[in-house]
């Protein structure tokens, strides 16, 4: 007798013992069967006949409980043999049926057996086991069976959490249906199992909302409130099938709600979550549930803003899910289907002469391979560990491993492949190689992306405004990036664009010494190497220009022995000489650099690699910026400003009385000199220029030459020490400072809309109310004591109240103080009555009361209909002209905007009053390449004058015609076309009733049309008609308005 025959004989005997066992010795008989089966059965032998008999015995009412007990013991989680496991799974449908048996003893044993199997099976065999359980839930009418199966699923979650997570899209609908069962016990068990199953949802963003999500399945009335809760959530974690399986039921119901606000929020959640999906196949099973709802809402929602949000969600879903333009859904990958993997392994086993009796084992192996494919486990060792014990049932181990490895390769080839990005090819020391995610406020910036930096390399970090370039730099500097080396392992220094204002009065040397980076001698030597003179080293930081502050920050970073320099806009405020110095320094210093810059020439000359933001990932390209653009043509706007598709538009400037051509000077400066108090010499001296509506002026010069001082005098921020400055009475100037954020830094907790409303709520620009040309100083107060002789009485002006035309100029209504006992001790000035007010010509007033006259001119300009209603819609439309969408303008705080978005807000706010002159100090700071291109085109099309201070020749070369070269306090103009009087060129016509006008309270001003002037013949005809009518009517005749002439 062979060993195999001996084994079969023992099994037959054990089977007989078990079939006649009583309740008292059933457990012992079952243990004997389990011990033998899970022991060392003869190689290449499996007890398939035993399990055929076992299945019949489980069905038999008389022996059912005994043999169920045997299965429970066979499925002992510690001892279940691979040669037995596939056959145990074939019994699951029968065991499920027995869990609903009328005999409570059988029910109990069947339920216990199902839980034992859930705990015992190989976790990757879930695809062979779970379908039996879900089919039982869908088909049975027995509530006891449902409760037992639900308990088995709960046990399976504990045993195979990661594998259940991938099966959630199939499991959740079945559990949801079961939660609606009429039987209380089933409802409670289903809810408990659903709660257990959601433990596989490894997503911190929705973790705390899972109880509400489960409640929504049972009670759809809770959907609106839950959507509201989730609408305020920041999504940063990767979205997996498990996450979507619990979220999609809620979102599909949210899209079908009546309230537009719920539909909008559901679209926002879909938009935010889909951006975090790594693989299109993750979202593929859910497209048919979300896409129709979004499409229907976009077609039917009346609110334009909600429709726009819905469209955004629709576009994101289509992009992430690879949906075509005609909404043909992509095919779901079948790489992990049992049919696919079974076909692959059967093909490989054709020449191996595998006996038909091993078919169940082969199918089981195919199921396990399918799960490994779904998990994207492609490692050879993992496949050997999980599957080799099952392959060796019918093959020798060495041969089994060869076949299994080929099986793995062919199965993996069926997985849909995403884009493959080659990493850098050259060798070198890794300073950083980490994977991380990054969010800012309510926005996800990077999701599970890799950052790899090597020693001595120079990297350019590129991406649009709001992508998170500066945020990434700060996060690295603050140690908030997972896996990035600590300062002890790798010294990383963030070189900021500007030094904190708290150090304004600190000397340059003391500032660096306070950083504890070396001795005074070493620090002084390094500063001298960076170009600082001895005088500059001892100067306060506040007296340094922006370019020298940048060099100071860089010197401090180098003294810290930095391994990595993080340079955020390093060329801001640097003139061409210092930019060339910086290029040479970075190229020769040997320090790894990560650079954010909008200066394409600088990146071209410095960078060896470009790290680009693409779909919440960082992708690395070898080469400088020009090489990057060749590989990525969509980024052409980084290289050519004109290539930008983004469009900005400035509002058309208001009409200026007396200005008939664009050449006429609206600002005129003659022999102007300015000197800061306490300095040894003037900053600028003997400067003359004029500006008109046609001006396109570039102000150039080295750092510290006096460019910003010149502009501050032009805009009224500073008053000249000597010389004359004339500005047209109604001229409005928009001035964006070099440090653009200075405009908004005290309003960070307002939304952009609230900031604009605050700034212009009085009708005037509150940002300009503290300008020097509007403040009354001692000299002004002294001049305002001028005594006027009016109607034979000495008077001083108390106030100026109104303005009217007077010949070719204006005259102003003034109230007075009457002088008594002038020149004596008892001199006094008594306020006069309003009836004593008088009108004084402008020429007489400006000598002594120029600032009061300017205030009246400002109010008259606003009263003439130039004021705009501060409504949310008007502000959103205005900001949209400068690249800010409504979501940012009305729903986001300024604090959460990126640097570029803040600059766009400053541009929008400064141009709110339809300026005649736009003055930009270093506009290339902080704006990305797309925005710079759009700004360049908008300034070119602007109907008013433009004055730009910049070191970027690229930005001004096609924009400006006139150049003011400032050097050593002197200004040399070139290319100018200054005229006296109106000058030549086309005439400007005043546009009547072009658009609605509003007063300071936002009320519409009804403008009556001017009556056409009649000719002499028309007047005679009208007179005859009037006389005829008068003759006919006699005393009853009354003239009408249209008969007056």
UniProtKB/Swiss-Prot annotation:
GO BP of this protein: cytoplasmic translational elongation; cytoplasmic translational termination
Highest taxon, organism lineage: Eukaryota
UniProt enzyme class: hydrolase
Positions of HEAT repeats: 5-42, 43-85, 86-123, 125-162, 166-203, 205-241, 242-279
Cited SUPFAM superfamilies: ARM repeat, P-loop containing nucleoside triphosphate hydrolases
GO cellular component, one term: fungal biofilm matrix
Biased composition (Basic residues): 1007-1031
Residues annotated for ADP binding in this entry: 42, 44, 83, 392, 396-397, 703, 922, 925, 951
Catalytic activity line of the entry: ATP + H2O = ADP + phosphate + H(+)
Name of one Pfam family that matches: ABC_tran
Region entry Disordered, spans: 974-1045
Gene Ontology molecular function: any one: ATP binding
Localization, UniProt: Cytoplasm, Cytosol
Enzyme Commission number(s): 3.6.4.-
Ranges in a coiled coil: none
Subunit structure comment from the entry: Monomer.
Biological role stated in the UniProt entry: Ribosome-dependent ATPase that functions in cytoplasmic translation elongation. Required for the ATP-dependent release of deacylated tRNA from the ribosomal E-site during protein biosynthesis. Stimulates the eEF1A-dependent binding of aminoacyl-tRNA to the ribosomal A-site, which has reduced affinity for tRNA as long as the E-site is occupied. Assists translation termination by stimulating the release of nascent protein from the ribosome by release factors.
Name of the protein described by the UniProt record: Elongation factor 3
Source organism per UniProt: Candida glabrata (strain ATCC 2001 / BCRC 20586 / JCM 3761 / NBRC 0622 / NRRL Y-65 / CBS 138)
Name of the gene this protein is made from: TEF3
């Amino acid at each position: 007798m062979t060993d195999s025959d001996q084994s079969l004989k023992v099994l037959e005997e054990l089977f007989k013992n078990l079939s006649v066992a009583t309740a008292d010795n059933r457990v012992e008989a079952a243990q004997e069967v389990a011990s033998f089966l899970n022991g060392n059965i003869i190689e290449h032998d499996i007890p398939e006949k035993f399990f055929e008999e076992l299945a019949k015995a489980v069905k038999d009412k008389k022996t059912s409980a005994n043999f169920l007990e045997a299965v429970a013991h066979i499925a002992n989680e510690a001892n279940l043999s691979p040669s037995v496991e596939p056959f145990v799974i074939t019994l699951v449908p029968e065991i499920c049926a027995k869990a609903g048996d009328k005999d409570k003893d059988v029910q109990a044993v069947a339920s216990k057996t199902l839980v034992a199997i859930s705990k015992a099976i190989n976790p990757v065999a879930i695809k062979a086991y779970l379908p039996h359980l879900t089919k039982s839930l869908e088909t049975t009418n027995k509530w006891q069976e449902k409760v037992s199966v639900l308990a088995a699923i709960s046990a399976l979650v504990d045993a195979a959490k990661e594998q259940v997570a991938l099966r959630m899209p199939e499991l959740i609908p079945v559990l949801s249906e079961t939660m609606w069962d009429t039987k209380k016990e089933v409802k409670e068990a289903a809810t408990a199992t659903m709660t257990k199953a959601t433990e596989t949802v490894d997503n911190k963003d929705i973790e705390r909302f899972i109880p509400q999500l489960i409640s929504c399945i049972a009670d759809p009335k809770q959907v609106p409130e839950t959507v509201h809760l989730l609408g305020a959530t920041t999504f940063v974690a990767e979205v997996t099938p498990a996450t979507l399986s619990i979220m999609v039921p809620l979102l599909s119901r949210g899209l079908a709600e009546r309230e537009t606000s719920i539909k909008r929020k559901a679209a926002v959640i879909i938009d935010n979550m889909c951006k975090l999906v790594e693989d299109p196949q993750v979202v593929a099973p859910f497209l048919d549930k979300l896409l129709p709802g979004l499409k229907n809402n976009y077609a039917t929602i009346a609110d334009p803003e909600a429709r726009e949000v819905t469209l955004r969600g629709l576009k994101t879903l289509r992009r992430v899910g690879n949906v075509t333009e005609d909404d043909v859904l992509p095919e779901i990958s079948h790489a992990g289907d049992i049919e696919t993997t079974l076909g692959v392994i059967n093909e490989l086993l054709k020449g191996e002469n595998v006996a038909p009796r091993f078919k169940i084992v082969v199918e089981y192996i195919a199921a396990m391979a399918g799960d490994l494919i779904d998990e994207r486990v492609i490692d050879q060792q993992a496949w050997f560990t999980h599957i080799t014990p099952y392959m060796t049932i019918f093959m020798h181990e060495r041969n089994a491993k060869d076949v299994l490895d080929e099986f793995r390769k062919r199965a993996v080839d069926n997985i849909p492949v995403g884009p493959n990005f080659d990493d850098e090819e050259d060798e070198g020391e890794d300073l950083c190689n980490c994977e991380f995610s990054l969010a800012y406020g309510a926005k996800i910036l990077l999701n599970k992306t890799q950052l790899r930096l090597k020693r001595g390399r120079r990297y350019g970090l590129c991406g649009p405004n709001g992508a998170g370039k500066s945020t990434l730099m700060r996060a690295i500097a603050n140690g908030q990036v997972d896996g990035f080396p600590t300062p002890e392992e790798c010294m990383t220094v963030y070189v900021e664009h500007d030094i904190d204002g708290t150090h304004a009065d600190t000397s340059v040397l003391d500032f660096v010494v306070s950083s504890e980076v070396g001795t005074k001698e070493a620090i002084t030597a390094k500063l001298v190497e960076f170009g600082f003179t001895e005088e500059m080293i001892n100067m306060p930081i506040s007296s340094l220009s922006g370019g020298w502050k940048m060099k100071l920050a860089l010197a401090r970073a180098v003294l810290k022995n930095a391994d990595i320099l993080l340079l955020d806009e390093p060329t801001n405020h640097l003139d061409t000489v210092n930019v060339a110095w910086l290029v040479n320094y970075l190229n020769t210093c040997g320090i790894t650099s990560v650079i954010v810059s909008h200066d394409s020439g600088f990146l071209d000359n410095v960078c060896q690699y470009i790290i680009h933001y693409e779909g919440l990932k960082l992708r690395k390209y070898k080469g400088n910026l020009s090489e990057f653009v060749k590989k990525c043509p969509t980024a052409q706007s980084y290289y050519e400003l004109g290539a930008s598709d983004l469009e900005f538009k400035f509002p058309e400037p208001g009409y200026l009385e007396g200005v008939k051509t664009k050449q006429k000077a609206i600002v005129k400066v003659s022999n102007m000199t300015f000197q800061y108090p306490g300095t040894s010499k003037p900053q600028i001296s003997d400067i003359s220029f004029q500006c008109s509506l046609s001006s396109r002026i570039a102000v150039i010069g080295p750092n510290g030459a006096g460019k910003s001082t010149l502009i501050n005098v032009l805009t009224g921020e500073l008053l000249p020490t000597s010389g004359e400055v004339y500005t047209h009475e109604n001229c409005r100037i928009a001035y964006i400072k070099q440090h653009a954020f200075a405009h908004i830094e005290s309003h960070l907790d307002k939304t952009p809309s609230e900031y604009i409303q605050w700034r212009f709520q009085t009708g005037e620009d509150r940002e300009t109310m503290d300008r020097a040309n509007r403040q009354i100083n001692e000299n002004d107060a002294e001049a305002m004591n001028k005594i006027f002789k009016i109607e034979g009485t000495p008077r001083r002006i108390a106030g100026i109240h109104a303005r009217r035309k007077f010949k070719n100029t204006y005259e102003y209504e003034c109230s007075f103080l009457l002088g008594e006992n002038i020149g004596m001790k008892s001199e006094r000035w008594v306020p006069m009555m309003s009836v004593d007010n008088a009108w004084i010509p402008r020429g007489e007033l400006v000598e002594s009361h120029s600032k009061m006259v300017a205030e009246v001119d400002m109010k008259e300009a606003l009263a003439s209909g130039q004021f705009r209603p501060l409504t949310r819609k008007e502000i959103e439309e205005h900001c949209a002209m400068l690249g800010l969408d409504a979501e940012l303008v009305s729903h986001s705080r300024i604090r959460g905007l990126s640097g570029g978005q803040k600059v766009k807000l400053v541009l929008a706010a400064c141009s709110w009053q339809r300026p005649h002159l736009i003055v930009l100090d270093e506009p290339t700071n902080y704006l990305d390449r797309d925005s710079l291109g759009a700004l360049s085109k908008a300034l070119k099309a602007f109907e008013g004058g433009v004055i730009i201070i910049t070191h970027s020749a690229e930005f001004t070369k096609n924009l400006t015609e006139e150049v003011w070269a400032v050097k050593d306090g002197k200004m040399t103009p070139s290319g100018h076309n200054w005229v006296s009087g109106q000058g030549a060129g086309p005439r400007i016509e005043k546009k009547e009733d072009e658009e609605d006008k509003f007063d300071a309270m936002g009320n519409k001003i009804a403008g009556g049309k001017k009556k056409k002037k009649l000719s002499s013949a028309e007047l005679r005809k009208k007179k005859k008609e009037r006389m005829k009518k008068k003759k006919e009517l006699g005393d009853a005749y009354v003239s009408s308005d249209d008969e007056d002439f």
